[in-house]
Regions:
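Conserved SAM-binding loop of SAM-dependent methyltransferases across substrates and taxa
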Residues: 33-45
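Adenosine-cofactor binding site in Rossmann-like domains, unifying the SAM/SAH pocket
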Residues: 51-72
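A short acidic, Gly/Pro-enriched loop at the edge of an enzyme's catalytic core
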Residues: 71-79
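C-terminal substrate-binding/active-site "lid" region of AdoMet-derived donor-dependent transferases
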Residues: 87-138
Length: 138
């Protein structure tokens, strides 16, 4: 499942880089100790990855509070994603996405609903991965 989600994000990033001519900047919010997706994304030379968490687990993770984000960290972000974010931070993640006008991917817990009001995130299935994506109003 995680390989399928990683590959979907890589494909999205490659499309973005091809369209813009620039590397794709991806920020993972609330990375915790599960860093395998961001680590896989970093293997691609066309992708710049920043991992954030309120309590960084190592030196590769930047300390940031989603309720008071350090906006300079997120400048020029193309894709935000979060794996199993608690319901209480999901609205703050969407608010940041709205400010940045970028793609948002959220992979909730298997049996959890999203807690994002008034936004129509699309359920996406890619291989064995199921997640929600929001690219703005169409």
């Amino acid at each position: 499942m995680w390989d399928d989600l990683s590959q979907y994000i890589i494909n999205l990033a490659m499309e973005n880089s091809k369209r813009t001519g620039w590397n794709t900047k991806i920020v993972e919010i609330g990375v915790g100790r599960f860093q395998s997706i961001s680590n896989r994304l970093q293997e691609n030379e066309n992708i710049e990855v920043i991992m954030t968490d309120i309590n960084p687990s190592n030196e590769n993770v930047v300390k940031d509070d989603i309720f008071n984000p350090s906006m300079s960290l997120y400048e020029n972000t193309d894709i935000l994603f979060s794996i199993r974010p608690p319901a209480e931070i999901q609205k703050a993640i969407m608010d940041l996405r709205d400010e940045l006008n970028c793609t948002l991917i959220i992979k909730p817990l298997f049996n959890e609903d999203l807690n994002i009001e008034l936004k129509k995130m699309k359920l996406k299935n890619h291989g064995r991965a199921s997640f929600y994506i929001y690219e703005g109003e169409n």
